Amino acid sequence: MGTNKPVVIGIAGGSGSGKTSVTKAIFDHFKGHSILILEQDYYYKDQSHLPMEERLKTNYDHPLAFDNDLLIEHLQQLLAYKQVDKPVYDYTLHTRSEEIIPVEPKDVIILEGILILEDPRLCELMDIKLFVDTDADLRILRRMQRDIKERGRTMDSVIDQYVNVVRPMHNQFIEPSKKFADIIIPEGGQNHVAIDSMVTKIATILEQKVNL
């Protein structure tokens, strides 16, 4: 493990943009190396104090839904090579689970989430900021597939949420945050040229750390 500060790579983009695919492609290339993924999705605010009817009204695409204070605290601890206990969010109960996931510090941290570029405090902690930019029609199709398959949602509920919440929030918060990115990746996980470029960049960073 290097003695200097870990490198933080931020990967942002709208829901269904392919940012998770980009993250996984980069991470899989470096399996066995000193690299970790920290997902903003795990840092939704605890809502255990609220009744279920209130939790169901949560707008998960709004910046205020995230506990960025805790995310920043954990990121700062990882930057100091300290272990953190990552929270787990229960989407069926719409609140934070009692489960935690211990995360060991690594030399390269991939921070992934829809709104990580929206918070200037998070941007300040990133060395490289990426925005995965994908056509809106493709994003909604991917979101429908995910929510129906993985979260037990109906097609009607997914479409209603997209029209009334996801699309407005994307236009208001996520799309404007694109201007803070150092690199914009069109077509998400299908953009092998961009992914290969990032792999080369990270490989250089890891090699420099080994030679310290």
Curated annotation (Swiss-Prot):
Record-level GO BP terms: CTP salvage; UMP salvage
Record has rRNA-binding as a keyword: no
Underlying gene: udk
Molecular function GO labels: ATP binding; cytidine kinase activity; uridine kinase activity
Cellular localization per UniProt: Cytoplasm
Protein EC: 2.7.1.48
Catalytic reaction(s) noted: uridine + ATP = UMP + ADP + H(+); cytidine + ATP = CMP + ADP + H(+)
EC top class named in words: transferase
Family of the protein in this entry: Belongs to the uridine kinase family.
Descriptive protein name: Uridine kinase
Signal peptide annotation: none
